[in-house]
């Protein structure tokens, strides 16, 4: 396949045009008075959105060189979205501002490598300032504020705050479609896994077809149980206490299952057998989680624990165990809190090390179950288009809220980035030559988001910037919705610090890469055949 090449200034100009195409489409959505963008879909109804990353992902340019620039800006938006769940539009606006100024200076003869070095130094200083300004979230109202701003809805903000309060910092919150038009939170307390009773004869509530035991003993093993003999000693010990027994094993069959069912039906021993969750190594890890949560041990051949030797101390305990046809819930495990915390810390470390998204999700789910539960936000709407848009907003708001809990909050509305110009100004004074130019580019770019917010709301950005900088209070800023100057924290105009930091760092990273690009290589499009009819063969 033949290639096409572009060099130096011509290459950078093509990239800039691609960047502008995406940034101009995205930046009109910034701020409380940002506009919407309607995106045509190849099937189904069009999508109406004001989410930066959704818009950026849809843009594909015809000119292959310009399209490279567009793809780079998409990278800024999606990287910021992956890390912080929000701030994609801010990141795009910052990247465009840095690239515009950078290309101007590089074209005038500045060394792109030194310019990039200056950009990096200035960004490091700005990030420190963002950390200084940030405030930790103190209560549920703060969480609701952050979520409301990101989702542009107080109702959604309250739902997310309620869900986070219930499941805690490490809990899992998922977003699903509701069967009605209402949006609400469903909460599953305790450890829940998708395995139910092996036989319906274990059922204690025939109406609901479920097994409910209070204060049961829990036997946990990774073996397949078919012979009853190894179980008899522990079954006798449990029967003497008068408490029920829950058996979680790889499988229970044959003689073992028959004996357990008969004991249950005669009332000798209330029991239920449940298949262990997961497969392979994941099953072993989940059984260990259940053991730690309930204060028991896993009777495993690998560690040489025989079923005949088990004592009551080796069994787990819980306040309630509820078993349905294909679901088991363990509520109020009696495990040692310190051990549970250690296990959660261990899973957290695994999450940080893994690169697989699927692995990350399963680890987070395990952590949530240990931490105390899973919340599901059920999203309802009148039409499919509204449902898609609402679901997307909730997912975004959820990520932004988690980011706020992690690194705290800063004043929103582009104010924090504007305040971060102060330390950058010092860097500009300290540096010289082309590095100074790089730092100056960042200094100018930091005012781009507030400028755009003001423009979208119909105000003059330069006047607002001047007015805001007259006050030294980092929280003092401009409410573009009401057209008033105010304390941004008091007014509830806040952003997660992680979102602001990620937006700046990702924008600078792409700008630096783009400025140091000297050659573009793309595939040459194949010439189209204007004669679609095949030639007739000659006979």
UniProtKB/Swiss-Prot annotation:
Gene3D superfamilies: GroEL, GroEL-like equatorial domain, TCP-1-like chaperonin intermediate domain
Broad EC category: isomerase
Enzyme nomenclature, EC number: 5.6.1.7
SUPFAM superfamilies assigned: GroEL apical domain-like, GroEL equatorial domain-like, GroEL-intermediate domain like
HAMAP family: CH60
Entry-linked NCBIfam families: GroEL, PRK00013.1, PRK12849.1, PRK12850.1, PRK12851.1
UniProt-recorded name of the protein: Chaperonin GroEL
Species the sequence originates in: Thermosipho melanesiensis (strain DSM 12029 / CIP 104789 / BI429)
Lineage: Bacteria, Thermotogati, Thermotogota, Thermotogae, Thermotogales
């Amino acid at each position: 396949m033949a290639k096409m090449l572009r060099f130096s200034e011509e290459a950078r100009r093509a990239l800039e045009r691609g960047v502008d195409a995406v940034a101009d489409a995205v930046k009109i959505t910034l701020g409380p008075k940002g506009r919407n963008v309607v995106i045509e879909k190849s099937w189904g109804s069009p999508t109406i959105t004001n989410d930066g990353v959704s818009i950026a992902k849809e843009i594909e340019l015809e000119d292959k060189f310009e399209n490279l620039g567009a793809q780079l800006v998409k990278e800024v938006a999606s990287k910021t979205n992956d890390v912080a769940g929000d701030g994609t539009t801010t990141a795009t606006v910052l990247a465009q501002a840095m690239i515009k100024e950078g290309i101007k200076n590089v074209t005038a003869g500045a060394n792109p490598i030194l310019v990039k070095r200056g950009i990096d130094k200035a960004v490091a200083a700005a990030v420190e300032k963002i950390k200084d300004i940030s405030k930790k979230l103190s209560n549920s109202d703060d969480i609701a504020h952050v979520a409301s701003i990101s989702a542009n809805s107080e109702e959604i903000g309250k739902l997310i705050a309620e869900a986070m309060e219930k499941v805690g910092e490490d809990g899992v919150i998922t977003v699903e479609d509701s069967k009605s038009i209402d949006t609400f939170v469903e909460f599953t307390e305790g450890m829940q896994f998708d395995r139910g009773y092996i036989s319906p004869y274990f059922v204690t509530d025939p109406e609901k077809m479920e097994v409910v035991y209070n204060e049961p003993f829990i036997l946990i093993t990774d073996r397949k149980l078919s012979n009853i003999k190894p179980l008899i000693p522990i079954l006798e010990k449990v029967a003497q206490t008068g408490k029920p027994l829950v058996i979680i094993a790889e499988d229970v069959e044959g003689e073992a299952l028959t004996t357990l069912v008969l004991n249950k039906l005669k009332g000798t021993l209330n029991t239920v057998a449940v298949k262990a969750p997961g497969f392979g190594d994941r099953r072993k890890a989940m059984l260990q989680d259940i053991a730690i949560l309930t204060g028991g041990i896993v009777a495993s051949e690998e560690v040489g624990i025989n079923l005949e030797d088990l004592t009551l101390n080796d069994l787990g305990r819980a306040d309630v165990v509820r078993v349905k046809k294909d679901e088991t819930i363990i509520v109020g495990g009696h495990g040692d809190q310190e051990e549970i915390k250690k296990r959660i810390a261990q899973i957290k470390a695994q999450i940080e090390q893994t690169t697989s998204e699927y692995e990350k999700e399963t680890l987070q789910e395990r952590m949530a179950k240990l931490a105390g539960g899973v919340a599901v936000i059920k999203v309802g709407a009148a039409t499919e288009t509204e449902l898609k848009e609402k679901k997307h907003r909730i997912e975004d708001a959820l990520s932004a809220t988690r980011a706020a809990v992690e690194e705290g909050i800063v004043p929103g509305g582009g104010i924090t980035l504007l305040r971060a110009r102060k330390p950058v100004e010092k860097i500009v004074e300290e540096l010289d030559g082309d590095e100074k130019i790089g730092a100056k580019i960042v200094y100018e770019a930091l005012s781009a988001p507030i400028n755009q917010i003001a423009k979208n709301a119909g105000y003059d950005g330069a006047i607002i910037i001047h007015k805001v900088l007259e006050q030294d209070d980092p929280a003092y800023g401009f409410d573009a919705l009401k057209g008033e100057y105010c304390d941004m924290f008091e007014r509830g105009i806040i952003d997660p610090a992680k979102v602001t930091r990620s937006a700046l760092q990702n924008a600078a990273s792409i700008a630096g890469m783009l400025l140091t690009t000297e050659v573009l290589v793309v595939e040459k499009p194949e010439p189209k055949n204007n004669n679609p009819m095949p030639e007739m063969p000659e006979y």
